[in-house]
């Protein structure tokens, strides 16, 4: 039983090796533009034959890989040259857009975009635009009608609309503009170099006479030197006011604000013994000060009490 399993496994392994060899031969034949039948020992139903006495096929089909004719630009001449070995056929349809980009379409319906500088083809227009940046061209987008070049594709699209039948300001050269200033200041190929609307050149005579320095007496004097300075608004005159105008009437101590004088007046109540609640540290505490109702009997008001004014 085990021998049968091993024999079947070896047979499958040998069949797999023959299949891989056949695939390698097929790849090489496609690469060399021809198909060579190398499965003489391979049966019709996919079963290998050890004797090799199976009947060979009568006809061998020759498969030729599709060739491509792409135009490669040359530095010496502007005329394109053909080179084969791409993915398109020479009989493909080719269309040249307004910006100079050539679009090729093969028999299967695939569209390819060809670079106008080196001839490489790409599947997408965005890939072609990204590739064209490596050629270091300042204005790669060229109009197919008037030949003007632009730096960005959006500028070319805006310019291409001027050649179409649109409402706007039309020039004698055939271009149409959206605004009057664009139509007025646009240039033609046969225009002179001077700017349109520039003023006429005038000659100015410059004297080479030596200029003497101006003395201070000849300089004009400002009005405030001769007439005096008078400000727009009258200056504020401050009276002789003390820095501490709040003065106690009992001990003549002065304070800068009324709140400080009010706290000072608490010291003239006439307490007979020391109470920590009457100290200056506890005066600012909420609920234990002199204004609290609970401290009324602890600190009786004497005849010398003065009502604080806030």
UniProtKB/Swiss-Prot annotation:
- Subcellular localization: Nucleus; Cytoplasm
- Specify one Pfam family: zf-C2H2_4
* ZnF region ranges: C2H2-type: 113-135, 141-163, 169-188, 246-268
Q: In the UniProt record for this chain, what is stated about the effect of gene disruption?
A: Disorganised A and I bands in body-wall muscle structure. Defective extension of body wall muscle connections or arms towards the ventral nerve cord. Double knockout with madd-3 results in severe muscle arm extension defects.
Is Cytoplasm there in the keyword field?
Answer: yes
Query: Any signal peptide, and if so, which residues?
Result: none
Tissues where the protein occurs: Expressed in embryos from 1.5- to 2-fold stage in myofibrils. In larvae and adults, it is expressed in body wall muscle, and in addition, anal depressor muscle and vulval muscles. More specifically it is found in the thick filaments of muscle fibers.
> Single Gene Ontology BP term?
myofibril assembly
A Gene Ontology molecular function term for this protein is:
cytoskeletal protein binding
Q: Which residue stretches belong to region Disordered?
A: 73-102
- Swiss-Prot/TrEMBL keywords: Cytoplasm, Developmental protein, Differentiation, DNA-binding, Metal-binding, Muscle protein, Myogenesis, Nucleus, Repeat, Thick filament, Transcription, Transcription regulation, Zinc, Zinc-finger
Residue segments, region Interaction with myo-3:
198-310
Q: How does it assemble?
A: Interacts with hum-6, mep-1, myo-3, unc-96 and unc-97/PINCH.
Q: What does the entry's free-text domain comment contain?
A: The N-terminal part (1-106) mediates the nuclear localization, while the fourth zinc finger is required for the localization to M-lines and dense bodies.
**Name of the protein in its database record:** Zinc finger protein unc-98
Q: Read off the lineage from the record.
A: Eukaryota, Metazoa, Ecdysozoa, Nematoda, Chromadorea
């Amino acid at each position: 039983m085990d021998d049968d399993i091993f024999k079947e496994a070896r047979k499958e392994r040998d069949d797999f090796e023959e299949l891989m060899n056949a695939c390698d031969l097929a790849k090489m034949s496609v690469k060399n533009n021809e198909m060579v039948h190398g499965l003489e020992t391979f049966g019709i139903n996919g079963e290998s034959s050890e004797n090799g006495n199976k009947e060979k096929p009568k006809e061998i089909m020759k498969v030729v890989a599709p060739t491509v004719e792409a135009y490669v630009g040359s530095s010496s001449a502007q005329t394109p040259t053909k080179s084969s070995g791409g993915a398109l056929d020479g009989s493909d349809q080719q269309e040249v857009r307004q910006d100079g980009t050539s679009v090729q379409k093969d028999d299967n319906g695939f569209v390819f975009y060809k670079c106008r500088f080196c001839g490489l083809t790409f599947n997408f227009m965005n890939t072609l635009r990204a590739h064209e940046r490596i050629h270091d061209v300042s204005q790669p987008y060229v109009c197919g009608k008037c030949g003007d070049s632009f730096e960005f594709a959006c500028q070319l699209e805006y310019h291409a609309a001027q050649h179409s039948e649109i409402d706007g300001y039309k020039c004698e050269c055939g271009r149409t503009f959206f605004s009057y200033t664009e139509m007025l200041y646009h240039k033609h190929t046969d225009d002179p170099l001077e700017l349109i609307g520039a003023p006429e050149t005038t000659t100015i005579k410059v004297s080479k006479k030596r200029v003497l320095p101006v003395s201070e007496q000849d300089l004009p004097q400002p009005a405030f030197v001769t007439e005096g300075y008078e400000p727009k608004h009258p200056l504020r005159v401050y009276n002789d006011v003390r820095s501490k105008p709040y003065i106690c009437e009992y001990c003549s101590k002065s304070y800068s604000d009324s709140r400080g004088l009010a706290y000072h007046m608490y010291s003239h109540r006439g307490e007979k013994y020391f109470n920590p609640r009457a100290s200056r540290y506890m005066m600012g505490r909420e609920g234990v000060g002199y204004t609290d109702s609970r401290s009324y009997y602890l600190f009786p008001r004497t005849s010398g009490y003065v009502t604080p004014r806030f």
